């Protein structure tokens, strides 16, 4: 069992996220990536821009990540034993493409209340400043913020939901190695930096 430590739980409560958490081996992460590439070739419509949701439903290999005991134990540490996977999303960074995810709060547009759920983000490749890692605004999970819908080219969010005036000097880069995970509160302001490949 891989339950979170008291220090990790305190970080989640105080900061709104925990990172990094080891959940997959490098070979498991590579196998998942190969599976996604296979789906892209054999069933491209299942994984295009509009179809990057719930791909675990068509792939036993990806479904095994959803049911990974290390992930579930960490999530259980935060929300308890009643765990429901509401959805999964793939953020795919293809070579020679630029993209980003604007700063937003999951709670604002997912519509699940109360906000006693958690988002698990599992890296299948290394995610760092050079290739576009997640960014979190610590302590921003204490309240819901206004969002604007901006349909900017390259934004990987379908509605372009954006929190304005995020203080970049307070934002933390969440660099992950393939197989590591971050957990974040549904109200934390977060995004994905511009991807330069």
Where would I find each of the regions flagged by the language model?
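Double-stranded beta-helix
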Residues: 129-193
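Coil-to-beta-strand transition motifs
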Residues: 83, 98, 115-117, 129, ...
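Short, structured patches in soluble enzyme cores that scaffold and shape functional sites
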Residues: 89, 105, 122-126, 138
């Amino acid at each position: 069992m891989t339950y979170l430590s008291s220090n990790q739980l305190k970080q989640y409560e105080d900061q709104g996220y925990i990172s990094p958490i080891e959940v997959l081996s490098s070979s498991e992460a590579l196998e998942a990536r190969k599976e996604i590439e296979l789906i892209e070739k054999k069933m491209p419509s299942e994984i295009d821009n509009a179809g990057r949701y719930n791909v675990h439903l068509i792939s036993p290999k990806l479904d095994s990540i959803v049911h990974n005991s290390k992930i579930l134990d960490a999530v259980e540490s935060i929300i308890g034993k009643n765990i429901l996977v509401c959805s999964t999303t793939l953020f795919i960074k293809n070579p020679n493409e630029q993209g980003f995810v604007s700063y937003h709060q999951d709670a604002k547009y997912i519509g699940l209340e109360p906000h006693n759920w958690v988002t698990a983000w599992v890296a299948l490749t290394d995610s760092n400043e050079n290739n576009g890692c997640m960014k979190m605004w610590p302590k921003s999970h204490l309240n819901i913020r206004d969002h604007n819908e901006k349909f900017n080219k390259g934004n990987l969010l379908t509605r372009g939901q954006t929190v304005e005036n995020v203080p970049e000097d307070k934002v933390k880069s969440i660099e992950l190695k393939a197989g590591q995970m971050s957990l974040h509160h549904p109200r934390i302001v977060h995004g994905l930096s511009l991807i330069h490949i």
